Amino acid sequence: MFISIGIDEDGRPYITTSDGAREKVVRKGKGNSVIDFPSTYTVLDIETTGLDPRYCEIIEISAMKYSSGQNIGTFSTLVKPSEPIDEYITSLTGITNDMLKSAPDISETMQKFYNFVGSDLIVGYNVNFDINFLYDNLLNCRSLILSNSFIDVMRIARKILPGLKNHKQATVADHYGISPAGAHRAAVDCEIC
């Protein structure tokens, strides 16, 4: 029986069972990658301070809820990191430390995001990256499991556009005549997706 959740010395989540044993959490309950498309879904994107959810932080989350092809709600917020972001992240995203000063912290943001997305199918570009950050932060901050199924648009693009020079979101958007101006801001990336 599950008793508590903790973080080990390497920053990885674990659970403690009733007999005192520690079990590593390997994103148990994480949703599946699917192909079927329901009428209601949420497109999401995050911006982070780096690539590894064990050491890097979320600095922006945007999610757009659709029903029958119409946007019926948007969740978008900057997230205050525990340390200032570096110049490279600012140059990539356009997000500055000044912009993050008054942003909510990750714990508050995770609960609001969880409430917004509910049980919707999640859609995004390279969304497995986003899901891993969100899964770990929901578990660490709120002891919640993100079990939503998801569709990764990048995986689809790789299958249907094998001849592209790469499968970055901007390259695929350009292929379809979509201007990726403002890319690497979460809300814009959601709209491109």
Go through each PLM region and give its residues:
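Conserved non-catalytic scaffold segment of RNase H-like nuclease domains
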Residues: 5, 10-148, 162-184
